[in-house]
Amino acid sequence: MFEQRVNSDVLTVSTVNSQDQVTQKPLRDSVKQALKNYFAQLNGQDVNDLYELVLAEVEQPLLDMVMQYTRGNQTRAALMMGINRGTLRKKLKKYGMN
């Protein structure tokens, strides 16, 4: 189960462990752990385009949730994200969300 804290400038992830205890940690900690796991699986192999890989993993669900929240209003979504509407449209097209 994942939730986002609303009254903060830091996005948090809430998880429920096997003892039904809810813990919260900053989203950045989850990203860091995911990258540690990714690097552990590489076994020394070279990687290209890691930045694009990570960005796509975060950007696509961000766009999806913002578009749902704004009920498809691209102007409002762009304002909410702090990007211009043309940039938003380009990103939506990139992920086949137009």
From Swiss-Prot:
Top-rank taxon: Bacteria
Entries under InterPro entries matching the protein: Fis_DNA-bd, Homeodomain-like_sf, HTH_Fis, Trans_regulatory_Fis
Localization, UniProt: Cytoplasm, Nucleoid
A GO cellular component entry from the record: nucleosome
Primary residence: cytoplasm
GO function term, MF aspect, one: DNA binding
Keyword annotations: Activator, Cytoplasm, DNA-binding, Transcription, Transcription regulation
Gene3D superfamilies hit by this protein: Homeodomain-like
SUPFAM superfamilies: Homeodomain-like (SSF46689)
Region (Required for the stimulation of HIN-mediated recombination): 17-44
GO BP annotation list: chromosome organization; DNA-templated transcription; positive regulation of DNA recombination; provirus excision; regulation of DNA-templated transcription; response to radiation
Binding region for DNA: 74-93
PANTHER family named in the record: DNA-BINDING PROTEIN FIS
Function text: Activates ribosomal RNA transcription, as well other genes. Plays a direct role in upstream activation of rRNA promoters. Binds to a recombinational enhancer sequence that is required to stimulate hin-mediated DNA inversion. Prevents initiation of DNA replication from oriC. Binds to hundreds of transcriptionally active and inactive AT-rich sites, approximately half its binding sites are in non-coding DNA, which only accounts for about 10% of the genome.
Quaternary structure (record): Homodimer.
Family note: Belongs to the transcriptional regulatory Fis family.
UniProt protein name: DNA-binding protein Fis
Organism (species): Escherichia coli (strain K12)
Lineage, broadest ranks: Bacteria, Pseudomonadati, Pseudomonadota, Gammaproteobacteria, Enterobacterales
